[in-house]
């Protein structure tokens, strides 16, 4: 720890803070050179996921944190270069002279491996060298080719509503126990966060089972914004409807309380977040979630007609509020979820491709 105090200029746009810190601190070679005598040096430096590193970070680590006679070893996979770092001859550009290529993959004997390899050849064939599974020992002692576990099934979703179709396929496999599939064996991958957030809510409220999602839940999104309104109630455009529903639920949920404790406020806002989440589902799928919304309204001591009337009365401002909720940045929540990922949660896993670590679907 060099005890370097980082200062961000007042009024700087949040969108520019990351670039500013990179230029002035994280990637500032001169800054580390000025403090080089204070830096502890190591006999060996091993770096994993080198494709995520800026070149300046590599230079800083190699020149200031490694003993001049020490080892410097980098591990990386150009196919995971999701931040678009520079590449040369289908590989990540680093500050080492030679590369020892690990040509073979020994991670999987499942049939999903074939899908991954086919995807590499067809989509990334001109950009990357594809993984070679030829040395994975695919033959038994009698010279017969082994059958890989699992199966690949392609389905054309005719229904434009992919969320409902996806749910019906997955629940059908679970309920019919196709291939002895349990929720814990299922991982759903895609690239659209908006679709996955809605699917996650659809799944949980339709079948009343939990999920293990690497994305923020819609309830968490609403809760984050409700807390912000609660702390910034003065001159907030959402004050009217926020105070209205807060006071109403306060009377229904905490009948004998004149003052709410912090835990009570959290519980009340959680009810609002859940109500708003199920209401969003109800608007898109009225035949599927009307009864579920009525059930949640009963928990809050209100009728579904009263909730619908409330939403209608504040329709314009609540429509704008919903846009803000769905378009806000929740990266910190996603990072925290990835950090605390647990594979054997007993539930289905939901993740975007760039947050998917390896072969957890096995």
Where are these predicted regions, by residue range?
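Conserved RecA-like ASCE ATPase "motif II neighborhood" in helicase/translocase motors
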Residues: 4-43, 49, 53-60, 348-355
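Conserved helicase motor core of SF1/SF2 NTP-dependent helicases
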Residues: 3, 44, 51-320, 327, ...
């Amino acid at each position: 720890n060099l005890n370097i105090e980082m200062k961000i200029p007042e009024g700087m746009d949040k969108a520019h803070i990351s670039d500013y810190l990179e230029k002035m601190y994280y990637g500032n070679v001169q800054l580390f050179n000025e403090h080089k005598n204070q830096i502890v040096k190591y006999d060996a430096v091993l770096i994993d996921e080198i494709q995520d590193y800026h070149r300046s970070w590599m230079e800083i680590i190699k020149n200031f944190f490694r003993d001049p006679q020490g080892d410097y070893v980098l591990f990386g996979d150009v196919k995971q270069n999701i931040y678009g770092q520079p590449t040369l001859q289908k590989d990540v550009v680093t500050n080492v002279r030679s590369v020892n290529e690990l040509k073979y993959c020994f991670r999987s004997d499942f049939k999903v491996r074939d899908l991954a390899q086919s995807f590499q050849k067809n989509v990334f064939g001109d950009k990357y060298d594809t993984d070679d599974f030829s040395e994975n020992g695919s033959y038994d002692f009698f010279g017969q080719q082994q059958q890989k576990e699992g199966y690949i099934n392609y389905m054309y979703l005719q229904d434009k509503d992919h969320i409902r179709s996806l749910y019906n396929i997955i629940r059908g496999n679970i309920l019919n126990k196709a291939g002895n599939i349990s929720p814990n064996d299922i991982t759903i991958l895609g690239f659209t966060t908006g679709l996955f957030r809605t699917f996650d809510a659809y799944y949980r409220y339709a079948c009343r089972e939990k999920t293990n999602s690497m994305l923020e839940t819609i309830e968490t999104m609403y809760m984050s914004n409700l807390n912000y309104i609660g702390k910034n109630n003065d001159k907030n455009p959402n004050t009217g409807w926020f105070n209205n529903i807060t006071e109403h639920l306060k009377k229904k949920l905490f009948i004998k309380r004149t003052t709410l404790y912090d835990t009570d406020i959290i519980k009340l806002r959680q009810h609002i977040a859940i109500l708003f989440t199920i209401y969003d589902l109800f608007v898109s799928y009225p035949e599927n979630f009307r009864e579920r919304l009525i059930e949640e309204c009963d928990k809050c001591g209100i009728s579904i007609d009263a909730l619908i009337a409330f939403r209608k009365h504040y329709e314009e401002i609540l429509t704008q509020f919903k846009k803000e909720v769905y378009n806000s940045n929740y990266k910190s929540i996603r990072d925290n979820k990835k950090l605390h990922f647990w594979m054997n949660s007993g539930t289905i896993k939901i993740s975007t491709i760039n947050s998917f670590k390896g072969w957890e679907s096995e």
